[in-house]
Amino acid sequence: MYEKLVSHKLSSFCEKYGLLPAAQFAYRKSLGYTDALLTISHHLQKSLGAGMESFIVQLDFSAAFDRVSRCGLLVKFKSIGVGGSVLSISTKFLSDRRQRVVVYGAASEWIPIISGGPHGSVLGPVLFILYTSEMFEVVVNKVFAYADDSTLLAVVHNPADRPAVAASL
C-alpha cells in the first residue's frame, strides 16, 4: 500500500511538471496502448498521404525494469527536483535488496540485486519511464513508447535522403 502511495505521488509530480515524455503512453493517467497505436497510425497515414516513405524500427528492451541503474535513477531524481520523503523512500526501496530462488522447497543462497527493483513492484514501471525519459530528447526521429516497447518512426521527405534517414534509426 505504501508503495502505491509513493508511486502515485511520484507520478503526479512528474505529470505536474511535464517530466514524462508525451510519447510515453504506459502507466499514465488517461493513456494506454490504443493511444500509442492510434498516434503511430496517424503519423504513418499522414506521411503516406503526402507521398512520403516511412521507416519504423520497433524495440523491446529485454528485462527492462531489471536493468535500471539505481545510482543513475537517484541522480535523475535529484536533477528533476525530487527530494524529501519521496527521495528518501525511493532510496530505501532501491537499496540493500536481495533475492533467492525456491524450487520444490529447496532455496538458493540470497544474492544482492545490483540493479532494478523488486519484481511485480507497483513503483518499478514509474521508475523505468522516468529513468528512460531522456531517450526521447536525443533521438532525431519520432519515438513512441509503451512501457519498455518503443517504436522509432522516421519519414523520408526526399528520396535522396533515404540512406541518411535509415542510418539515423
Q: Model segments located where?
A:
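Active-site flanking residues adjacent to catalytic metal/cofactor-binding acidic residues
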Residues: 59, 147-148
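RNase H catalytic domain
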Residues: 150-159
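Hydrophobic alpha-helical membrane-association signature
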Residues: 36, 127-131, 165-169
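Conserved pre-catalytic core of RNA-dependent polymerases
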Residues: 1-118, 154
